[in-house]
Amino acid sequence: MKVAVLGAAGGIGQALALLLKNRLPAGSELSLYDIAPVTPGVAVDLSHIPTDVKVKGFCGEDPSPALVGADVVLISAGVARKPGMDRSDLFNINPGIVKNLVEKCAASCPKALIGIITNPVNTTVAIAAEVLKKAGVYDKRRLFGVTTLDVIRAETFVADAKGLNVDKVRVNVIGGHSGVTILPLLSQIEGASFSAEEVAAMTKRIQNAGTEVVEAKAGGGSATLSMGQAACRFGLSLIKGLQGEANVIECAYVEGDGKHATFFAQPILLGKNGVETVLDYGKLSAFEQEAMEGMLATLKADIQLGVEFVK
């Protein structure tokens, strides 16, 4: 398996690369790209770690050499949030970066599974889809917005609040990947019950967890380490699916049946083609139903921004 990380010199990219070097299947190739000249050095640094994963680093304007033959591409390139910004404030810079990188993916590895980490994910995934359509290589089963960070935060916060073993906690998070579009399905968690006040507070904390990190870092960055872990978990799940492992399920922001919006985060079954099945997210509580209906205008507007960006 060959995995390419685009944006590999950044905070998320380096954390992700370190985790993948340690956790990819033996014999895998890890290809690191960033515009920054430090990137080949990041690869050399990682190459000293004793695992059977070959690492190569590429820098400069053209990511194509890093992409040839890639099975999975994870894109974290872009600028991070600073205090006072929300994910939509990144719209002035990051969409152009994602557009350029996905154009190169379309040319160099059109069959690869592409995971978009770069915010605002609600919009950048729509941009990626339009770019791939223009190139004639779009396959909705092979494009993902990585929302795993919302899932691992939900699992961590719930386990902490309820004194549960975090390894046993599973939380589906549906919708999108910013603010009110993040909807953890707390009503479905086995072995935990919440009062109405707890549901409202926990939902808000999960939705605002990124801001919690941005503020705590006091201008020194955003959630890079936890995002690296989340992206690694999702990337490894993509690979398990490609290798034919059964019952590999993650939540991700994908093009489904369009019932709610063109792109929607929900549980998916992964396989050799990427998304094998978009799974039903189950019955919602009254709170969740209201929250879901309330987010849709925001989500659809975010998606439309991406579509119009590429036109």
Swiss-Prot record:
One of its GO terms (molecular function) is L-malate dehydrogenase (NAD+) activity. Its EC number is 1.1.1.37. GO terms for cellular component: cytoplasm. The keyword Metal-binding does not apply. NAD(+) binds at residues 7-13, 34, 94, 117-119, 227. The keyword NAD applies. Catalyzes the reversible oxidation of malate to oxaloacetate. Homodimer. PANTHER family: MALATE AND LACTATE DEHYDROGENASE (PTHR11540), MALATE DEHYDROGENASE, MITOCHONDRIAL (PTHR11540:SF16). HAMAP family: Malate_dehydrog_1 (MF_01516). This is Malate dehydrogenase. It comes from Aeromonas salmonicida (strain A449).
